[in-house]
Amino acid sequence: MHAYRTHTCGELRKSHVGETVKISGWLHRRRDHGGVMFIDLRDHYGLTQIVFNPGSPGFATVERLRAESVITVEGKVVARDAELVNANLGTGEIEVVGGAVSVQSEAAELPMPVFGDHSYPEEIRLKHRYLDLRREQLHKNMVLRSQVIASLRRRMVAEGFTEYQTPILTASSPEGARDFLVPSRLHPGEFYALPQAPQQFKQLLMVSGFDRYFQIAPCFRDEDARADRSPGEFYQLDIEMSFVTQEDVFNSIEPVMRGVFEEFADWEGKGRKVAEGPFVHIPYAEAMLKYGVDKPDLRNPILCSDVSDIMMRDDVTLAVFKKIVGGGGIVRAIPAPNSGDQPRSFFDKMDAWAKKEMQAPGLGYMRFVEENGALTATGPIAKFFEPAALAALAEKAGVKAGDALFFSAGDKTAAVRLQGQARIRVGEELGIIEPGVFRFCWIVDFPMYEWDEDNKKVDFSHNPFSMPQGGMEALLAADTVEKQLDLKAFQYDIVCNGVELSSGAIRNHRPEVMLKAFELAGYGPEVVEAKFGGMLNAFRYGAPPHGGIAPGVDRIVMLLAETDSLRDVILFPMNQQARDLLMGAPSPVDERQLKELNIRLAPVVKPQP
């Protein structure tokens, strides 16, 4: 018989009754029932219940051991009585009558229990991540992650893609976030950078004559943590293709994304589905108008509208809205379907939320009702609208009697931000978010440039390597700031249930077009040559039209696992302060290492309170 196990803790079934077996695992839970000891033994594969009678050779051993001690048990498989069968457990039809017990490792007193669903502070969980990972749900999440990555690889190969590995040590480049820098011992005073993404390398692969590249790529960005972004590193399904249009990229990636989500839609019996039909295409401007965000959750049926023009009518006397629109601001309407009978507290709650969470002046509203066959409205601001104005407002906003309408007003940036978050909030409060479905969309026609208010200049809105729609002709014709801000890029995002999974683009593969695009953003040729010279020079020797995308693996798994935090799908994540509490990183290093790297530390200057 094997030294540790003949079967795993999730393997034994009724067909094994009568067999003598040996299983090993962690002592998950112990229960004393009138002198008879029951334990659950756990390993990677599941749980097995073991019963020890008072005369059993292992009784005294399991009685004294703490939870999470690692033991090997030899015993006989017996069937449970019908009324004791646990249908929620794979091994629930049997139990093992325990005999000899070998202790492989005794557990000290635990800083946090593994059994149960108790909530513990993140600091304790991350410091003792090896205990946290033993907990059932987190353990399942990590297995799901592995299965998702395997599925992605399999599907990419089936679509004709080939996996290649790109360098981890590379040059620093201004791609958005701060770089993690690595000092060079051989070249004092010079630094490598960990790649924020394999962006330039995957494009160079296309220039090198390869096609349909993919990689499960680690990416490193020195940025603050968010629920949907983990500090330090993350993984993405990095993709690039040659001789493709935007539609070609969509047609290649949709089957992969749909297939993965369909494969795991029923994970853990969740009974979800992927919405039928091709992924919806939504222009960026339309997304910002209808949803107030560029990553809309299409499970929410609420569609917003711009009602600024209605506020300037003569039969509308709401002075505050007129002043906002007259000063260049906007007013957006957010419908609240079938909420006209909601109590006043619902509307007060929304207004309080806007003031506290969004730092907005408030969230005006009105309720639409029918009186004597005519549509009218009630609420604090309804009195400022004549019947004809109310009818026009209802028609434009798409509301009817029994609905309510919230208003977001202010300068465009603030009003749209409040509109987007209010739409989400109203949908959640009314319980109208469609359950059990994954709804994808492509956001297209992103602006090439945006206005940098801090530096009072035009700059790239997203990826500087995107091909402008219209090419060089469009760039040459953009001779004013207004025209430059109207330029669109062949750039796109893929979104699922309000989560941006990836940005992508058709690349700017022509050196003269790239230099002109950077020129409009205020970067001279010397800057482009210094930062992107390797890629620019490669383009001078013949570059194919190419494009790609890079869906985030962590976010895909987060959606499938139905968790709100990326840390729940990453094995050993950092905390919010970008510290690895388990390994103690970052940490000081000794003087010898610094000397080898020709580094001298400056005194840390603490900010004044």
Curated annotation (Swiss-Prot):
GO MF term list: aspartate-tRNA ligase activity; aspartate-tRNA(Asn) ligase activity; ATP binding; nucleic acid binding
BP term (GO), one: aspartyl-tRNA aminoacylation
Entry EC no(s): 6.1.1.23
Residues annotated as binding ATP: 221-223, 500, 552-555
Region annotated Aspartate, chain positions: 199-202
Cell compartments where the protein resides: Cytoplasm
Enzyme class: ligase
Residues reported to bind L-aspartate: 175, 221, 462, 507
Keywords, in A-Z order: Aminoacyl-tRNA synthetase, ATP-binding, Cytoplasm, Ligase, Nucleotide-binding, Protein biosynthesis
Record bears the keyword Aminoacyl-tRNA synthetase: yes
Site residues, Important for tRNA non-discrimination: 33
This protein's GO CC annotations: cytoplasm
InterPro entries: Aa-tRNA-synt_II, aa-tRNA-synth_II, aa-tRNA-synth_II/BPL/LPL, Asp-tRNA-ligase_1, Asp-tRNA-ligase_1_N, Asp/Asn-tRNA-synth_IIb, AspRS_core, GAD-like_sf
Reactions that this protein is recorded to catalyse: tRNA(Asx) + L-aspartate + ATP = L-aspartyl-tRNA(Asx) + AMP + diphosphate
Primary site of residence: cytoplasm
NCBIfam families on file: aspS_bact, PRK00476.1
Family listed: Belongs to the class-II aminoacyl-tRNA synthetase family. Type 1 subfamily.
Assembly: Homodimer.
Function: Aspartyl-tRNA synthetase with relaxed tRNA specificity since it is able to aspartylate not only its cognate tRNA(Asp) but also tRNA(Asn). Reaction proceeds in two steps: L-aspartate is first activated by ATP to form Asp-AMP and then transferred to the acceptor end of tRNA(Asp/Asn).
HAMAP family associated with the record: Asp_tRNA_synth_type1
Protein name listed in UniProt: Aspartate--tRNA(Asp/Asn) ligase
Organism per entry: Hyphomonas neptunium (strain ATCC 15444)
